[in-house]
Amino acid sequence: MGTNDQTRSLPRGLRLVAVAGAAALTLTAGLATPLDPAPRQARAADDGKKVLTVAVAQSVDSLSPFLAVRLLSTSIHRLMYEYLTNYDPKDNHAVPGLATKWESSPDKLTWTYTIRSNSKWSDGKQATAEDAAWTFNKMMTDDGAATANGSYVGNFEKVTAPSPTKLVIELKKPQATMTALDVPIVPRHVWEKVSDFSEFNNDKSFPVVGNGPFVLTGYKADSYVRLKANKTFWRGAPKFDELVFRYYKDQDAAVSALRKGEVSFVAGSPSLTPAQADSLEGAENIQVNDAPGRRFYALATNPGAKAKNGKKFGDGHPSLLDRRVRNALFMAVDREAIIDKVFRGHAVEGEGYIPPRFQDYFWKPSASQKLAYDPAKAAQLLDRAGYRKNGDGKRVGKDGKPITYRVLCHATDPNDKAVGKYLQEWWGDLGIGVRLDCLDNVTDPWLAGKYDLAFDGWSVNPDPDFVLSIHTCGALPATPQDTGATDNFICDKTYDELYARQLAEYDPAKRADIVKQMESRLYDLGYMNVMAYPNAVEAYRTDQIKSITTMPAKAGNIYGQDGYWSWWSAVPADSGDSSGGSSTAVVAVIATSLVLLIGLGTVVAVRRRAGADDRE
């Protein structure tokens, strides 16, 4: 599924929210909907406020930063809360967030962060190091609070706040992600009142107290998320007064809304299809952005769902536990055809786990290791594995029954459906049946392990630790009744050992080499088969948005950034202000902060490494 996208692992307590939200498709008054015969222009509300409306295909899994993993949700949290550090929109290196500087002890086991004194919560209270210490300590001591981002604090020994502007984190072992802790810092005076972090979704009382560039003011499940500009944000107030994320189940309807001016921006599901993008090319007042993406698009195979306590659950097909079968299936997937016929060139053929946008970590299998497209060899593998065809040309399992695999498919993603039809053809030629289960809610069967294969995808951060952690044994649920951070129930000792090594390695080149070994291991296991690296294809109205920052500055995406840069920097088209929306202007602000850091003699021991071009 995917996002950190991060787009998966919905806590069981959220299922009722998701199910109830599926029926709530009517927007509040003031928002354009298919039921509104006279939808308002997105660029300005009736009261003169400048509103930026973003059409999205994904629904919110939770508005709690302790639970959310979907790309939309984590993107909203980047707007609501500051993180200790941020990613530079130009090249992804670490820049100040809530922390103005940071340094480590010689042994790299103690990290000290200076917390800025000019960040306030939206209720007027000062944001301090105590808020950060409380956030991390809560994640360290409460399993519910560790649901989404627990991997970041698993190696923490102690976190303290000696003063309002000083945060100290002591580690058990060296940890290479200390300037890449993608954890929203929340206000202690608000969140310490929460009794059950595994159930609290932060979606009942508005406005929600935060200290980011926007304040959450309204939400309706599967309808909209509304935020207003934080006029006291320390980096400067956004130029738009309001930001609205509006849910569209039908992406053609979202594209139509963009044409009519009912929305300012459309992201697609998770990108525009080639046909949608082509239909917008050359349209008046519409700009299409087509850039290398930070996502991978994969087929995940059920490895036999199990919990940390060793108990198995779910009903994945037993034949998929044979690596020869998994390899045969992938060798029967024509990835070039997927790029050409489904993505129509708006993607790169997939192999390794991390997209080529992040060159430091990009890995490709060797010629002898690669599972190249070879249907004949795939058939031979299945024969050798004992899954031969019967008289009707159908492959049969050990139970003598014809094999048909259930493939989980996102109902809102046209790529899933298109690739699924090809799988029915390609695997059908092997004698294997395919049943596409295209659902609005794939979370329930996924968490229950009731699938054979599934379309999967995650947005990768400049520091890839999170997307690596979701395949460790430690990410499994504690029991079959619990929810873990796991993506696909993979648990492999060799992979776990490599994960621990990369996390403790501060040398960038050495760490990158270990990460590539992890990708190689994941590839060989055959449970996560990457088919493509889709481009970020999106569009916006130039008569509503004058300028907006892409990330990275050159050939970057707008939606789903590792930061708040796009929506914070966006300048309304009818605004006389030209200082806040360009990438150059944003970089200038960052550069000023870095000059201050250098003047203070800060030593940054570890930085987020950028890819050649650039969750949740």
What are these regions (language model features)?
Residues A146-N149, K158-V159, T217-K228, V244-K312, ...:
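Extracellular/periplasmic solute-recognition and catalytic clefts
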Residues L25-L27, D36, A44, K220, ...:
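Detector for C-terminal structural segments
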Residues V183-P238, E242, P375-A376, Q380, ...:
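Gly/Pro-rich hinge or "lid" segments in bacterial periplasmic/extracellular proteins
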Residues A55-P106, N137, P207-V209:
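N-terminal lobe/hinge region of extracytoplasmic solute-binding protein
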Residues T114, A148-V194:
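Surface-exposed binding/hinge segments that line
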Residues V56-H77, L98-T100, K125, M178-V186, ...:
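A structural "hinge/loop" feature
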Residues T100-A145, V168, F245, A254-A257, ...:
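Aromatic- and charge-enriched surface segment that lines or borders ligand/interaction sites
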Residues T53, T128-T135, V168-E170, G212-P213, ...:
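Alpha-helical secondary-structure segments
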